[in-house]
């Protein structure tokens, strides 16, 4: 039990039906995401149509998403439990920050990991820019290096955010950072969103370039393997653009709205403030969308690849028919010449 009692308005927010519905809504999103994630993993394992490094990075994003969803579910269940058990005890309903040390740090670590994963996906597409680059022959090594970078890099920003935090304060639930870390955390989030937007801009440039190059190869290159690799590169870049955009779409507004709410907190009713903040769990929605994107893109890539292969086969069949016709005509011509002389 905490030694700090919640104010009556805070206690009313935490025990309100609206907040309980919010917990149920977030947990429902998480449960659905587990089912779609299972399907997306099967697709990547059995029906993979992406380059090796891209696939491995998507696996790392999925695993991180599962961990984040589990942590979020535990945090929400604990908050829901407090709202029911301590509904009449405002002095026990809050969480001391020390009680949230493990959950909170893992929650924010997986949050940053997802953005570094987007950065790795972009680097993978950037290094694949040249079709004949040696990078294509070292996909497994590249994925190991990039995944290790994703694991290590979030530690730096998180250390800066939390190194001077006091864990004796109290929070409404474990998604709330200690008060000393709030502004620094929002600075990190704002920088993260800006970096993701820049990555999306350059990823779109790569996508457009790969699309133009693929169309040119249709008319200038007749090597099936080269055209196949070019088409695969174009489709993989498109998938990465969608993944980065989905994270910006989910994380960007939640970070921006939270910053605005904190700045104008005094002019916003407390109940609305905490209720809306509780819905702004951007990465939960991003993790919900990621497996859906993988499933959708897999179907699109498989469909377009079948069309592409069929076109190549039709062209080859047409070429063979053309040469067979020429051979037949040549045979007739030489036969006629033999009869004439």
UniProtKB/Swiss-Prot annotation:
Molecular function as annotated in GO: G protein-coupled receptor activity
Main location: membrane
Keyword Cytoplasm: no
Keywords: Membrane, Transmembrane, Transmembrane helix
Protein name: Serpentine receptor class alpha-28
Gene encoding the protein: sra-28
Family classification: Belongs to the nematode receptor-like protein sra family.
Species in which this protein is naturally found: Caenorhabditis elegans
Any single Gene Ontology cellular-component annotation: membrane
Transmembrane segments: 25-45, 57-77, 107-129, 142-162, 188-208, 242-262, 275-295
Gene Ontology terms: biological process: sensory perception of chemical stimulus
């Amino acid at each position: 039990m905490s030694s700090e009692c919640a104010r009556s308005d805070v206690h009313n927010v935490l025990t309100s039906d609206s907040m309980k519905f919010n917990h149920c809504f977030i947990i429902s999103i998480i449960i659905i995401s587990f089912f779609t994630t299972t399907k997306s993993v099967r697709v990547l394992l059995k029906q993979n149509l992406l380059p090796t490094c891209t696939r491995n990075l998507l696996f790392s994003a999925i695993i991180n998403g599962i961990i984040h969803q589990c942590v979020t579910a535990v945090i929400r269940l604990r908050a829901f439990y407090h709202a029911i058990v301590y509904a009449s005890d405002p002095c026990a309903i809050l969480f001391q920050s020390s009680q949230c040390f493990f959950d909170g740090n893992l929650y924010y670590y997986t949050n940053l990991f997802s953005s570094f994963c987007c950065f790795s996906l972009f680097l993978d597409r950037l290094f694949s820019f040249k079709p004949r680059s040696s990078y294509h022959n070292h996909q497994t090594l590249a994925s190991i290096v990039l995944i290790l970078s994703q694991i290590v890099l979030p530690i730096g920003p998180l250390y800066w955010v939390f190194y001077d935090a006091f864990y004796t304060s109290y929070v409404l639930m474990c998604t709330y950072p200690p008060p000393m870390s709030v502004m620094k955390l929002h600075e990190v989030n704002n920088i993260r969103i800006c970096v993701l937007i820049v990555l999306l801009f350059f990823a779109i440039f790569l996508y457009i370039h790969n699309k133009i190059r693929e169309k040119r190869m249709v008319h200038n290159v007749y090597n099936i393997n080269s055209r196949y690799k070019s088409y695969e590169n174009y489709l993989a870049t498109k998938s990465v653009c969608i993944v980065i955009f989905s994270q910006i779409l989910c994380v960007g507004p939640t970070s921006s709205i939270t910053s605005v709410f904190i700045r104008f907190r005094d002019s916003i009713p407390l109940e609305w403030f905490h209720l809306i903040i509780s819905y702004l769990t951007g990465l939960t929605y991003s993790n919900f969308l990621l497996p859906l994107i993988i499933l959708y893109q897999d179907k699109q890539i498989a469909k377009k690849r079948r069309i592409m292969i069929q076109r190549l086969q039709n062209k080859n069949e047409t070429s063979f028919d053309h040469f067979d016709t020429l051979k037949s005509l040549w045979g007739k011509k030489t036969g006629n010449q033999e009869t004439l002389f």
